[in-house]
Amino acid sequence: HAVFNLVRLSVPLMKDGGSIINTASVQSKKPTPNILPYGATKGALANLTIGLAGVLAEKQIRVNAVLPGPIWTPFIPAGMDEDSVESFGSQTPMGRPGQPVELASAYVMLASDTASYTSGTLLTISGGAVPL
C-alpha cells in the first residue's frame, strides 16, 4: 500500500507535467520460484505504474517504472550463499551483474524532458536478459 498511498498524497501537490518513477524488477515478469512474494509485489507495482499512467495522463503526469535485472549491491553477499554470490548475474547475456551506476541514466532520462511523451513504460535494465 505504501506506493499507492504515497502517490495518492503527492499527486495533489505535483505540478502538471511531473514525473513518477517506480522501481519494479524483472522478477515482475518472470519470477524466480524461491522469491515468489518479491516477484508478486514487483508485478503489482508494474501494473500500478501502467494503471496510474492512464489515470494521471490528463494532468500530464508521467508514470514509468525501471525494471532492474541482477544489480550488484552490498545486500547481495549478505543474503546469499558463497556459490550464489559468485554466479550472481552470470546468467545474463552480458555474463555479469549490473552496477547501480548503470541504472542511473534510466532514471535521469525518465525524469527529464527527453521523456516528455513517455508514460506507462516498464524500462528493463538487465544486461540483455529479456523477461517474458
Identify the meaning behind each predicted range.
Residues G17, K30-L36, E58-K59, G95, ...:
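Active-site loop immediately N-terminal to the catalytic Tyr-X3-Lys motif
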Residues K29, L67-A78:
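Short, flexible catalytic-loop segment of classical short-chain dehydrogenase/reductase
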Residues P12-L13, G54-E58, S116:
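Alpha-helical segment proximal to the catalytic Tyr-Lys
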